[in-house]
Amino acid sequence: MSGTDHEAVSATEARRLFADWKAAPAIVLAVSGGPDSLALMWLAARWRKALKRGPALAVVTVDHGLRPEAAAEARAVKRLAASLDLPHRTLRWSGDKPSTGIQAAARGARYRLLAKAAKTLGASHVMTAHTRDDQAETVLMRLSRGSGIAGLAAMAREIERDGVVLARPLLDVPKARLIATLAKARIAFATDPSNADPRFTRPRLRELMPQLAAEGCDARSLVRLAVRAARADAALELMTDGAEQFLASLDAGSERPGVNARAFLGLAAEIQIRLLLRTLSRHGHEGPPELGKVEALAEALSQAAARRPQAAAKIRLKQTLAGAVISLTGDRLVIVPAPPRRGRVR
């Protein structure tokens, strides 16, 4: 990214930032009224105006119903959108709100509403205003939780979610540059007090960033870690694809369930774990399994195979995880959907 960390984003830079989405039919801009999303709207509008042909832009604000100021902020976004010749609509998160995990629940609701709006408007993409600062904080949060390589890759520039493509054109732009962009354009913005609420993890980690930066662990370094983790994760996913194909080839023409256990356990531990994650996600009915539990499963499979003879019909391990049944029987590793739990209404 050219320019210092406190310079306004130029029109030339904006063209580069948004260039990947020039051919999109329509794009929804997720704008809350805060500095990052207002800068996204301002830059996207200028970029689109400079194109002879390009995507239709529409602005969507989600009011979570959690702050009384949110309605006024949505109206302010609507006024600015109108001045930029952009259509705007406000969507509201209705219904009961959870007493715990409110931020995660609000985030999930926001993405669902944005995806629904995109489909209604015929938009292929939803753009959000995540910045370099957000990416660094995400890496720090995942480091603190002991995430694997995929987790440390943090947010992708593009990812499919809820049937639309979520795009983050500002992911390598410092927040300070977006604030400078608004100052230059004389655009006022709102501040969400929850972004500084110490009850939540992200604001607490944000407070630590200056101290970490003084030790060399600044946003740029954390984002560099995310880039390298993403590169390693992509390579490991390719290796996992190859391993999956290899295991399938061993049983070509056979109707035997599962895979060859000896061949599976001969793979590198990381590839075993990724194959288990894939298969459990495919056959389980309780959502994606926790990485730590899958790591424990891989270790249990290895120990079971090592200590017991491979009698043809001998069950050496059987357990359930994430709504799937895993069994190591003879020389076969089989993962199938678990039966519904007794008393559960389905």
UniProtKB/Swiss-Prot annotation:
| Biological processes, Gene Ontology terms | tRNA modification
**Native species:** Rhodopseudomonas palustris (strain ATCC BAA-98 / CGA009)
Q: SUPFAM superfamilies given for it? A: Adenine nucleotide alpha hydrolases-like
**Record's comment describing the protein's domains:** The N-terminal region contains the highly conserved SGGXDS motif, predicted to be a P-loop motif involved in ATP binding.
What keywords does the record list, in alphabetical order?
ATP-binding, Cytoplasm, Ligase, Nucleotide-binding, tRNA processing
Residues annotated as coiled-coil are none
Write out the annotated subcellular location. Cytoplasm
Q: What is this protein called?
A: tRNA(Ile)-lysidine synthase
Record-level Gene Ontology MF annotations: ATP binding; tRNA(Ile)-lysidine synthase activity
